[in-house]
Amino acid sequence: GAYFDGFDVPCVPRRDDC
């Protein structure tokens, strides 16, 4: 979903681009 630190995560409160 949102690329954070090279990982594809759904929605994180740290770096989210939903």
From Swiss-Prot:
Expressed by the venom duct. This is Conotoxin AusB. Disulfide bonds join C11-C18. Belongs to the ConoGAY family. GO terms for cellular component: extracellular region. The cysteine framework is C-C. One of its GO terms (molecular function) is toxin activity. The keyword Secreted applies. Transmembrane segments: none annotated. Does not show any effect on voltage-gated sodium, potassium channels, and on nicotinic acetylcholine receptors (10 uM of toxin tested). Does not show antibacterial activity on both Gram-negative and Gram-positive bacteria. Negative results: does not show effect on Nav1.1, Nav1.2, Nav1.3, Nav1.4, Nav1.5, Nav1.6, Nav1.8. Does not show effect on Kv1.1, Kv1.2, Kv1.3, Kv1.4, Kv1.5, Kv1.6, Kv10.1 and Kv11.1/KCNH2/ERG1. Does not show effect on muscular (alpha-1-beta-1-delta-epsilon) and neuronal alpha-7, alpha-4-beta-2, alpha-4-beta-4, and alpha-3-beta-4 nAChRs. Keywords: Disulfide bond, Secreted, Toxin. Its main location: secreted. It is found in: Secreted.
